Amino acid sequence: PFAHLYPMTLAESASTFAEMILTEGQLSNPDLNDAQKLAILDTETSNGAVFLTDLPVRFQFEKAFHEERAQGEVEVSRLKQLMAETQRGLFGETLEEGGEDPFFWASKLHFYITGVTFYNFPYTFGFLLSRGLFARFKEEGAAFLPRYEDFLRRTGQDMAEGVARDSIGVDLTTPDFWKGAIDTLLEPVAQLEELIDRNPGGEV
């Protein structure tokens, strides 16, 4: 009864699915040169990096903040510490010493949209859900489309788990679906690496 409005997770899924159709169509264009392919693949893989690293940092920080705020006021010094710790925890050794951005919480509007808490989470959820569904579409072809249309129709009638289960037949409560969605990024990464190797001087 509380799902009469479509959730942000499914809104992001639909928009990202459409982006993937466009990206796939562009990359299949035989007239595309290496520079154009490189630009498209760089965007796709860079987006993947943002959705799988930067946005989870935002979510984990916001979660930690809400937990501490429930106990009382959180000082600026503690906000900075929470942000730096979260960034270090997610990025690990890929983040150079002192490379944290402790004031990141102050520069992102999404943290201050009080009407939608944890606004960053739907982006990663929708990104991975759409990639998982697009992988099904590539496997099944046109036979997938009626179920995807049903998926879109059901938004606003149930939670994301129920919509995906009843329309597509996928279980979002198990790690396998999400792991498979992440694995779909391996192909564009490999294609990007091949293009870079083919043009070692950076001239494409």
What do the PLM-derived regions correspond to, one by one?
Residues 3, 20, 28, 35, ...:
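C-terminal, non-catalytic "cap/extension" segments appended to globular domains
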Residues 13-25:
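Signal/transit-peptide handling
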Residues 41:
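Active-site region of PLP-dependent enzymes
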